Amino acid sequence: MKKFKRRLSLTLRGSQTIDESLSELAEQMTIEESSSKDNEPIVKNGRPPTSHSVHSFLHQYTGSFKKPPLRRPHSVIGGSLGSFMAMPRNGSRLDIVHENLKMGSDGESDQASGTSSDEVQSPTGVCLRNRIHRRISMEDLNKRLSLPADIRIPDGYLEKLQISSPPFDQPMSRRSRRASLSEIGFGKMETYIKLEKLGEGTYATVYKGRSKLTENLVALKEIRLEHEEGAPCTAIREVSLLKDLKHANIVTLHDIVHTDKSLTLVFEYLDKDLKQYMDDCGNIMSMHNVKLFLYQILRGLAYCHRRKVLHRDLKPQNLLINERGELKLADFGLARAKSVPTKTYSNEVVTLWYRPPDVLLGSSEYSTQIDMWGVGCIFFEMASGRPLFPGSTVEDELHLIFRLLGTPSQETWPGVSSNDEFKNYNFPKYKPQPLINHAPRLDSEGIELITKFLQYESKKRVPAEEAMKHVYFRSLGPRIHALPESVSIFSLKEIQLQKDPGFRNSSYPETGHGKNRRQSMLF
């Protein structure tokens, strides 16, 4: 064994020590233990070793770096094996590939470590395979590094790295993938350029930015970290939920940058939110666009609710829209995953104007139906151009609700008469008013749908999945219901945004800078 290591150290060039030589050699192959009595090579189907960083990844799969790939000299293993390896078969070049002998707890083979034991098993098992060079596609890179589905690394970047590779036969280890992503530029603040401040809140500041990696616009949500408290729980919730929510109508979280002083969430950038959109069209939206936006809200919510995720803070400022008309749910800071059976949650969660009456009266046991009341309020606001229940206090909010929908009774809302807060307010006995009087632009089907959202009893509110099938959306055609989750409704040629009657050309998309810009993305 000592003679083997001495000969190896004299043969391999570019390494400073024997251990380094062995470690470098281990990246090309792993010696396999066998019960075979002789030393003849055994040809087996092996798997390529896992790379440990972008540089080693590129080194293994390309010849683009100056350092030549490591080759096994004929004199190292012995004449018979050396001559065997030197003989090409069928005119093709063969490379050595070995199966891992044993995987350690860190995902690396025992022989691949520079601190491995000096005892090296005799190389009795060798795997050979043809080395086929090909250019890595974007799909390969996404698969290899688990990049977000809509991240498109520019072709020029791939050309600069000069990457070419055989097919990927196994995923990278978690540690290797982290290193690879970091070396590409993910997780680093220097990858992003701040262009302008969009808004500032208690815990966070939001900037419009640009990614140097993709050249795309991004929204940078910079959350200040208090050393005593760490990251706000809202930030932790948002990250933990968004990383698992991949849908055409949910904002995409591209990257996370963590430093000692801040946690920056890198989102896809959309031009404006629904509040700004309504302001820009003078609060007179095309009823066709109202229908398209409502459908997209329901589509994103249905996806969340199928996964038992409650948004809990629906409002126009949290619905982002791009120039194409694609609407996406944003700001999941108050969202949380709901387990079964129902648990008790905080009742201080939803913006006042869009908060359902059961939560206003102190209920802390709720399900996905908590979001559906807010959908009804937003539907009304888009159709009428004004908020439905703009209360300034909890009592004022309840008063506005009861005055329009009628003061609830034991018959219309079982259990309300025993609610202490309801009894303490002592509201007048209002009779319900026809909704059509307040939203005359809605047709009868729209009035029927909004009524299904605005139910006092939460369990009677129509679920998002069911609402998408309502006759109100019949004019959008049948194909919209068969789209994959990741595909935009605007991929259908029959789905097009119309010009709004009150739209001001000069205001799109440059308005909204300043104090109220992107308040939806702030804590």
Curated annotation (Swiss-Prot):
Residues annotated to bind ATP: 198-206, 221
Catalytic activity annotation: L-seryl-[protein] + ATP = O-phospho-L-seryl-[protein] + ADP + H(+); L-threonyl-[protein] + ATP = O-phospho-L-threonyl-[protein] + ADP + H(+)
Record's keyword annotation contains Phosphoprotein: yes
Domain Protein kinase: 192-473
GO molecular function, one term: protein serine kinase activity
EC assignment: 2.7.11.22
Residues found modified as Phosphoserine: 9, 80, 92, 105, 137, 146, 165, 180
Bias (Basic residues): 514-523
Positions annotated as active site in the UniProt record: 313 (proton acceptor)
Biased composition (Polar residues): 110-123
Keyword ATP-binding annotated: yes
Alphabetized UniProt keyword annotations: ATP-binding, Kinase, Nucleotide-binding, Phosphoprotein, Serine/threonine-protein kinase, Transferase
Top EC class of this enzyme: transferase
Pfam families: Pkinase (PF00069)
Disordered: annotated span: 30-55, 103-123, 501-523
Subunit structure as annotated in this protein's UniProt entry: Found in a complex containing CABLES1, CDK16 and TDRD7. Interacts with TDRD7.
Recorded family membership: Belongs to the protein kinase superfamily. CMGC Ser/Thr protein kinase family. CDC2/CDKX subfamily.
Described function: May play a role in terminally differentiated neurons. Has a Ser/Thr-phosphorylating activity for histone H1.
Record's protein name: Cyclin-dependent kinase 17
Organism: Mus musculus (Mouse)
Phylogenetic lineage: Eukaryota, Metazoa, Chordata, Craniata, Vertebrata
Gene: Cdk17
